């Protein structure tokens, strides 16, 4: 599994990384385990000499760009609000006049997140998080004319997704009351104790009166609501929801309507696959949504469907589309505008709700976002004026606004930040007649007369993709003098739903061969040193790293972050086993063979590749025992191995000191083994070990 948050921040080229919050920590708390010993966490992190290694010097020299969490255009298209670096202010910029930005301060030094405009474009609501051990937030409203702001409500628990009602009298939010941690399977899990599942925290829709601040929980207490959208008349919501554990049951969520007064739920649809982004049509008679095989909430990709609110059969508007829809909004009675991953690029298109005709509006060699997460834009009521956060491998994030495709840059937050790495190309190759796409980052000082090592980066997911986003981690690898290939093998987004479905019941099969074919294709085209290959990934990428080691000895070194070594034991260890059934076709108890044949642990005696293993000790998505199993197995078979456990970290390694340590150890591991003598680690051709 991935990743972002809403899926994973595990690797910066994946679609699911930018939402990850960086939290302050006074010390680096890590445990380092090597092939023969364990040592004190703090001592392990301290440098042994006063001089920096080359890897450390290169990583520390990388440009520091400011991040942008969200950009939202007002419904009238005249103003844009955004949040940068989770700071305690919001900036408003007039799109048409280009006026200087204004700030809305939050008293008490609180961090602001998740903006929402009022329908009349006169107010902005946002969430401010209190500095407390367990989630506690405040809901604020600011008047954009006078910039006066006031606190509307105190909220105990995890709150997200504020949205004004069509008449602006209410603000709806998603609230998990008294939740002891942030929501989602990516954050550090609460250590287990006592009776399991004695308390299940459900995420409910709550409304807050904009005058009195009165809070009312509306949706049923036994349902976990993942997403919602106001009906045009304000009387109901379209929601995706499921009973039971919210972390686990997103993969079996159904489509409902919820009465905004009584909370009565009515089922509209039981989808065949996962469902995301439900949106009412302008007349309130239909609901559009995205459905496809998805491995993580928030990492959205699939086709666009429409279903009557009254129920009935859903229509696929985009069957056979060679792209993955990621977000949508109705722009007319029979027109839907959507964003997409199209061949690894960001795209914007429209589809007719009547005929299903798709029209490409824009696409580019860059990453577009509006919420700091996936491919998405913020769209005004006219269906054309928009705000976006634009970034690419060579350009750091900035806020842009204007007509789609004719945006004007509004911010200069990173105007002095320049890429310190080589160029990047959108590359293609074939395997077994299947076209595969990826991104190739060149060494900084590229010279066609020389050969350079190559690192393969495998994204999380598997339903995700490498995207052309700003990444200092990959930039550092380029600055070290290495190629970086981030492949999008079968199972990824960007080539259509049929392509994403192609690794179902085939983990480690066609996807692995696609990656290896990519290495050979790059070596034919560019001066790749095939005696110095590396592989690295986190989550599903960590699994693929472990799997690759059992299938070939071509790699000189490997780094497996939050990897899965044994699918059978993993099924009983993780908090999200529902995700596995769509991908493996059955539970592990009904078809253990399909899990066993894709488990690296069953072929561990083939491994010769020196391996670095990294994991958070409170990872609920890919629990640390999976990494312990791999570490123990590699020690037993005599493979050089180091194992790092980050304390109080979840699936995402998010604390700044730990994130730096993660990236530094990764670079240093490849540097060490790329420099090793050929007699220490011979490369060889691939061998077959799978039944």
Q: Language-model features: where?
A:
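A flexible loop/linker signature enriched in serine peptidases of the S9 family
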Residues: 84-90, 106-112, 125-140, 154-160, ...
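Cap/lid segment of the alpha/beta-hydrolase catalytic domain
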Residues: 405, 411-531, 536-539, 569-582
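Short loop/turn segments that connect beta-strands within beta-propeller blades
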Residues: 94-98, 143-147, 209-213, 259-263, ...
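Beta-strand-rich domains and repeat architectures in extracellular enzymes and scaffolds
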Residues: 60-88
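Active-site-proximal cap/loop segments of hydrolase catalytic domains
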Residues: 486-691
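Non-catalytic accessory segments flanking enzyme active sites
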Residues: 69, 172-174, 181-183, 198-205, ...
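Hydrophobic beta-strand positions that form the internal "hydrophobic ladder"
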Residues: 77-80, 124, 168-171, 237-238, ...
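Residue-level detector of Asp-centered blade-edge/turn motifs that repeat once per structural unit
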Residues: 75-76, 119-120, 166-167, 232-233, ...
